Amino acid sequence: MDTKMYDLTGKVAIITGSTRGIGNAIAKLMAKNGAAVVITGRKQEACDKVAAEIEAEGGKAIGVATSVDDPASRENLVKTTVEKLGRIDILVNNAGVGGQPRNMLDMDEEFYDTIMNADLKAVYFMSQLVARQMKEQGREPGVDPYRIINMSSAAGIKSPRGDTVYGAAKAAVTHLTRIMANELARYGITCNAIAPGYVLTDMTKDVMADEKNVAAVTKMISLRRYAMPVEMATVAAFLASPAAAYITGVLIPVDGGMTIN
């Protein structure tokens, strides 16, 4: 196997929501593969801590506190990245609000807006800012393209009860990714999405600690187990690598077979 096909040396990658969970695993793997990574989260202290962990392992990282649902904060992230690292080659739109089951008849507009702003609107406008920067940097279509990777969800494929807003937002992210791929290809940018299923993270570990919950969840999954964050990271790192240069506009479910079960 030609390991250079997975090498990210010289690339600059922004991973939103990377102080913990899936985003953290993605950032650490991309750094291990040679990328300079930008760690983002709401608290600067948490961002700096993860960046320091990466640098202690020989990687390159900076931390930039960011609220992806705030336009000024998004702009500061892009500006700071370019000022400190010189460019942007990879964007992973990972930050968002997790599914919090609430039936449609109990939904209120404030909760609806919170989910949509974080899980769809932020993805759209974060991608817009970074794509503008990538266009300015210049790249011929098909020549070592820039990458935008969006985190969708299995909830955007299946139709889970109580996840009307979250599921709709993630389904929209999937279709947005396809449209982005078509529109941004002319600037040498590929756009793909990943749909995680149930993943053990800080946000889900309490739920997964209950044996009844674990049994109920694994029953829905063909491989009969939940995923670990690194299993999402390996796919993201692949999509960011030279090995995936000819892939654009696709959704990759990483769900252990949940969406086919």
Which residues does each predicted region cover?
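Alpha-helical segment proximal to the catalytic Tyr-Lys
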Residues: 132, 182-186, 245
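Conserved glycine-rich cofactor-binding loop
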Residues: 12, 19-20, 43
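Active-site helix of classical SDR
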Residues: 127, 169, 177
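Short C-terminal tail/terminal secondary-structure segment
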Residues: 2-4, 101, 158, 237, ...
